[in-house]
């Protein structure tokens, strides 16, 4: 079984019962869960003071336990406050041997992008303690794809995507759209050329999703990729004023501007049903009438 080390660099864990349920679910499955005290920390809306949350991250460089999964408790907001003070060099150096398998999403995207930008460190965009492992019921699709990514040096995700017939190969990167936008022009924005960019978000109206995608487009980031994959955009509900404008309108507009394939429909993001993606790994994307495949390799895995 595996060792989970919890970190809480973002928002306060308001759903304490869900966090405890997640810990219990993992221990019942035979796993060991360390650093559980972070779930109770609070300072204003954050999961502790800046010093405490920063230490969650910087202390990873001193973590010597082998075969360790570092799991973010939740997202929210707070990671952006820490970026300038993270010891990136120490974390990058730590990942050169027996790398920690670092997993999270949402606000945690800022940390993941920083690690990729500062030292090509691969992390996993996937489930977190509260929202996923601590849900009323752990989604079997999510659980399967989590272990699929962490246990296999090469694995393939399949879905029925929407978009043109294509084949693209490159570095898989991305995560939460709003967090990526917040990093443009900073040292923590990865400079990936000819990559496969995967994006998701939550509670953003379709026009806000479009505006953020256009910012990536106008900044030259989208045109420099081989392909774009869009996951779930939970809570992106149009209203009467939109008069038919919706996410499909956004996708159509972007496709009219881009010369690279934009593939939608991947179960990836804030929904209970989500895949786990190693950001920074090598990926091959194929989309045909029969379906879509994403084959991923080159990421760290658990040693069985």
Curated annotation (Swiss-Prot):
It catalyses: N-acetyl-D-glucosaminyl-N-acetylmuramoyl-L-alanyl-meso-2,6-diaminoheptanedioyl-D-alanine + H2O = N-acetyl-D-glucosaminyl-N-acetylmuramoyl-L-alanyl-meso-2,6-diaminoheptanedioate + D-alanine. Gene3D superfamilies: Class I glutamine amidotransferase-like, LD-carboxypeptidase A C-terminal domain-like. One of its GO terms (biological process) is peptidoglycan turnover. The keyword rRNA-binding does not apply. GO terms for cellular component: cytoplasm. Its main location: cytoplasm. Keywords: Carboxypeptidase, Cell shape, Cell wall biogenesis/degradation, Cytoplasm, Hydrolase, Peptidoglycan synthesis, Protease, Serine protease. GO terms for molecular function: muramoyltetrapeptide carboxypeptidase activity; serine-type peptidase activity. SUPFAM superfamilies: Class I glutamine amidotransferase-like, LD-carboxypeptidase A C-terminal domain-like. It is found in: Cytoplasm. Pfam families: Peptidase_S66 (PF02016), Peptidase_S66C (PF17676). Its EC number is 3.4.17.13. The active site is at residues 106, 200, 270. Pathway: Cell wall biogenesis; peptidoglycan recycling. PANTHER family: MURAMOYLTETRAPEPTIDE CARBOXYPEPTIDASE, MUREIN TETRAPEPTIDE CARBOXYPEPTIDASE. Releases the terminal D-alanine residue from the cytoplasmic tetrapeptide recycling product L-Ala-gamma-D-Glu-meso-Dap-D-Ala. Can also cleave D-Ala from murein derivatives containing the tetrapeptide, i.e. MurNAc-tetrapeptide, UDP-MurNAc-tetrapeptide, GlcNAc-MurNAc-tetrapeptide, and GlcNAc-anhMurNAc-tetrapeptide. Does not act on murein sacculi or cross-linked muropeptides. The tripeptides produced by the LcdA reaction can then be reused as peptidoglycan building blocks; LcdA is thereby involved in murein recycling. Belongs to the peptidase S66 family. This is Murein tetrapeptide carboxypeptidase. It comes from Escherichia coli O157:H7. The gene is ldcA.
């Amino acid at each position: 079984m595996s060792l989970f080390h919890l970190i809480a660099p973002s928002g306060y864990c308001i759903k304490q019962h869900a966090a405890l349920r997640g810990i219990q679910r993992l221990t019942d499955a035979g796993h060991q869960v360390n650093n559980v005290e972070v779930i109770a920390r609070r300072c204003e809306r954050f999961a502790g003071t800046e010093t405490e949350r920063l230490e969650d991250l910087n202390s990873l460089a001193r973590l010597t336990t082998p075969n360790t999964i570092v799991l973010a408790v939740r997202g929210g907001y707070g990671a952006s406050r820490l970026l300038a003070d993270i010891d990136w060099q120490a974390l990058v150096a730590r990942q050169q041997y027996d790398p920690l398998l670092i997993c999270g999403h949402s606000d945690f995207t800022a940390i993941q992008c920083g690690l990729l930008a500062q030292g090509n460190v691969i992390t996993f965009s996937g489930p977190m303690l509260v929202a996923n492992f601590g849900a009323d019921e752990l989604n079997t699709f999510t659980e399967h794809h989590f272990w699929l990514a962490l246990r296999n040096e090469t694995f393939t995700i399949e879905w029925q995507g929407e978009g043109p017939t294509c084949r693209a190969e490159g570095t898989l990167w991305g995560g939460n759209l709003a967090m990526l936008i917040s990093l443009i022009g900073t040292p923590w924005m990865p400079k990936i050329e000819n990559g496969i960019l995967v994006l998701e978000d939550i509670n953003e109206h379709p026009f806000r999703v479009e505006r953020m995608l256009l910012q990536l487009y106008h900044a030259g980031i989208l045109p420099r990729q081989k392909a774009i994959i869009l996951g779930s955009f939970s809570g992106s509900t149009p209203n009467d004023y939109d008069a038919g404008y919706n996410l499909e309108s956004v996708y159509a507009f972007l496709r009219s501007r881009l010369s690279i394939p934009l593939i939608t429909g991947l179960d990836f993001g804030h929904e209970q049903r989500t895949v786990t993606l190693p950001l920074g790994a090598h990926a091959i994307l194929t989309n045909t009438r029969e379906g879509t495949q994403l084959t991923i390799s080159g990421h760290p895995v658990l040693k069985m």
